[in-house]
Amino acid sequence: MSGGLNMVYMLLGTGFEETEAVAPIDLLRRAGVSVAAVGIGGKVIVGSHGIPVTADMELGQMDLTQLDMIVLPGGVKGVASI
């Protein structure tokens, strides 16, 4: 845990911008922050450039009692699907 953060959830919807999701997840985890990629509509989500990403969990599995931050990556279709 870093900076008092318990959990950060990165919401991934079909068409999300891959670099806007994967790079922040990587950097936050390197800093010791707990980050989970959350798939909207399944665990395997396809980004805006056709790259499939396997989420850590699906939307219904989020523990909101531990939530500190939700991150929404860009991508027109990804944002619309969230």
Regions inferred by a protein language model and the residue ranges of each:
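Extended, subdomain-level signal for the structured scaffold at the beginning of enzyme domains
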Residues: 1-82
